[in-house]
Amino acid sequence: MKLGFIGLGIMGTPMAINLARAGHQLHVTTIGPVADELLSLGAVSVETARQVTEASDIIFIMVPDTPQVEEVLFGENGCTKASLKGKTIVDMSSISPIETKRFARQVNELGGDYLDAPVSGGEIGAREGTLSIMVGGDEAVFERVKPLFELLGKNITLVGGNGDGQTCKVANQIIVALNIEAVSEALLFASKAGADPVRVRQALMGGFASSRILEVHGERMIKRTFNPGFKIALHQKDLNLALQSAKALALNLPNTATCQELFNTCAANGGSQLDHSALVQALELMANHKLA
């Protein structure tokens, strides 16, 4: 099957590699250089999203935010400048659910199919092919693309119609942010009280407080390893989507708003490109105490 992939960053590169390893011919485009491993697997690098679309049956998009997806789709050399008849656009970025519905409608009007399929699992999940994939769109289109999703992830769910995948991802990001904040508070509390955070985390991992966030991000906080698997700047973007959507729904998300303020503090102190586990640094600043 002829596939296209647009956006080869921290997540997109390993995802595209997994598709290429399965024997699929890929045409790709990205802002920076294409990884040598991907080229060695036969991927063809082209200049524009239009060229990717012309050469492909199914086109995957993995870019940072809503404006970038809109440019990829509808820009001067975007996907929609090629014929979309018989083609499927699969947007795996994390973007606005409201705009996603508009994008899907416009692609459908031009004869193409559209799935929104944001992911969770970070760089590790992308590399290992264990992502959780939350899909919005037509069931028949989902079933057609599902074998490709299975090369990228393990927990693959058709949530509902177009936009529902993105809504699910926003909910996911709320939960992840609040859990990172909770782990940060707990370990910082233990550390300032004089306990060893390494041993506290070890004890908590055996009880009801155990979680993937405590396992992975708790370790990063203790070891001070904040190289980005998922950048604070991107989580700020996701929580902005949550808060904007909540406002439209006349819904209060008080703890989400608090987490966003903590991410904003990190960003204001030069941490926007750090891993989101570095949220702990905002709490450390207020406590005048480093966890480790």
Swiss-Prot record:
This is 2-hydroxy-3-oxopropionate reductase. One of its GO terms (molecular function) is 2-hydroxy-3-oxopropionate reductase activity. InterPro entries: 3-OH-isobutyrate_DH-rel_CS (IPR002204), 6-PGluconate_DH-like_C_sf (IPR008927), 6PGD_dom2 (IPR013328), 6PGDH_NADP-bd (IPR006115), HIBADH-like_NADP-bd (IPR029154), HIBADH-related (IPR015815), NAD(P)-bd_dom_sf (IPR036291), Tartro_sem_red (IPR006398). The lineage of its organism: Bacteria, Pseudomonadati, Pseudomonadota, Gammaproteobacteria, Enterobacterales. It holds the Pfam family NAD_binding_11. Induction: By glyoxylate. It catalyses: (R)-glycerate + NADP(+) = 2-hydroxy-3-oxopropanoate + NADPH + H(+); (R)-glycerate + NAD(+) = 2-hydroxy-3-oxopropanoate + NADH + H(+). NCBIfam families: PRK15059.1, tartro_sem_red. Belongs to the HIBADH-related family. Pathway: Organic acid metabolism; glycolate degradation; 3-phospho-D-glycerate from glycolate: step 3/4.
